[in-house]
């Protein structure tokens, strides 16, 4: 079976380096808030060309901390407003994005996507009072550059995929180092990257149970350990190589499968034609998803579905403003299928996956 994720292979390749990094971190005797956390935050600052980096326990908590900061700014600028701010989120993404804002007290509005799963542009980018956008880097695609990232009304989620230094970070970017991401932690981890010193100070205080403000506000305990950061620093040495390998695999599949888009039933690669893509997942759309899903798994290819439903269909979203059931995002959710995608795939496995998909549609 070609497993969907390459965690076992990556560990086998890096075992000695990871165990050595773990030993060095443990021998320091400082398991949190130590030198490896500092080193990793400095590396990430340089990688993203952003002045301030704050690590935390997960990408979801990173996004929630940004949301809590923006809510506090909203309350100062709208002292008599009885309504919380509103965040516009794409209807097709993992529920963690929505949960971060719900937990921070925001109103949530779900927005339809284009045919590649990226959120359509809303009026929020022009900065109306209390309205914000949160474009998500779904599957590794970068949100449209049409978003005015630097206007303070955009919060970016999913920046873990591309990790580039173009300066377009809006109010701040939330980054996840979940083990399935392009730059993975061995356990969990996240980060906030920003040019905003006030957001930086808020995040530093909030993640440490508000100790820096002498507990003048509430906070939480949200940290990456020294061991996590020591191990992820090992992986930073390979990230460029891994990203290039992902691009090569994606380009190969897009070439091999391109003609299937014009068949009935057909298949379309969602990364095809997307200019900036880090290929954290390789997702195809087909009206015959269930048939292809079963065929691939029966032939030793572990396919998965990301995601079988939209956020608007979840019980928690029953009162949210959202697209209708014939929207693009809902239609996508009924046909998306994820193929195994990781740098450790062999050339033979990449070719085998292509051959099996082609055989399915040529039968």
Regions found by a protein language model. Give the residues of each.
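Active-site phosphate-binding strand-loop segment of PLP-dependent enzymes
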Residues: 114-185, 191-193, 197
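Conserved coil-to-alpha-helix start sites within the AMP-binding
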Residues: 92-98
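Short beta-strand->loop structural element characteristic of the AMP-binding/adenylate-forming
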Residues: 107-117, 304
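Phosphate-binding glycine-rich loop
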Residues: 30, 34-86, 100-104, 110
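N-terminal "arm"/small-domain region of PLP-dependent enzymes with the aminotransferase-like
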Residues: 1-30, 340
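PLP-dependent aminotransferase class I/II
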Residues: 8, 20, 36-43, 47-54, ...
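Conserved glycine-rich SAM-binding loop
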Residues: 59, 93, 342
